[in-house]
C-alpha cells in the first residue's frame, strides 16, 4: 500500500511506527516532546532507529486522560507536522478521532489518519479521509470491556468500521486495521488480541499493533 510518497510492502515485511506525543499527559512520554525542538529531536532519533512512519498525537487517549478541544489539539499537532514535513522525508500519521483536527493535519502534510474510534466517534471523519485520499488506520475500541464472544465481536466491530470507510469512498488499499490493545479490553483480552492477529487478517487488510510497552 502507498502512504504518502512511499510504498509499503505490507504482505512481506513488518514496519515500525514511531510515536511522537506532543501532549502533557500521555501514558509513557507525556510532557517529554511538547516543545518544537524536543519534538524534532525525538523524531530524528526515531528515524535513525528505524521508524518507517511517524505518528503525531495531540491528545492523550490513556485511561483517565484529560480531553482537549479540537482547536487546542490542532494547535498542538499542526506546527509539528508542518516542521516534520519540511525536515524529514518520512510518512506522517496524525493520531486523532476528530474530523476537524484530521482535516487541519492533512492540510499541514499528514499522510495517514490514525483514528482510535474507527470512524465511529465523528461522523465527518470518513469524509475528511475520503476527500483527501489519505490512508487511514481504523482501531477497535469500546467504552466497556464487555463481550460475549471476544474475537468474533472484535472482527464484527472492525468490519463495521471498514464498511463506514468504504461507504464514504475510502479505497480498500488505503485502510489499515488495529485491534486496539489497551482500549476497551481486559488484560486477558489484550493478550488474546495480540495472540490472534492471524484471525484479524481474515478481513484482508494490513494490521497495525500498538502496545505501550
Q: For the regions a protein language model found, what residue spans apply to each?
A:
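N-terminal amphipathic alpha-helix/helix-capping segment at the start of soluble metabolic enzymes
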Residues: 1-24, 169-170
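Short, well-ordered coil/turn segments that N-cap beta-strands
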Residues: 11-16, 51-52, 86-90, 109-111, ...
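Conserved, mostly hydrophobic/aromatic
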Residues: 20, 46, 50, 95, ...
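Active-site mouth loops of central-metabolism enzymes
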Residues: 22-41, 66, 93, 144-152
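Conserved anion-binding
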Residues: 24-26, 61-64, 102, 108, ...
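Glycine-rich, proline-tolerant flexible connector loops at the mouths of alpha/beta enzymes
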Residues: 26-28, 52-79, 181-187
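Alpha-helix-loop-beta-strand connector modules within alpha/beta enzyme cores
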Residues: 66-94, 99, 103, 129-137, ...
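Catalytic beta/alpha-barrel core
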Residues: 88-97, 111-122, 154
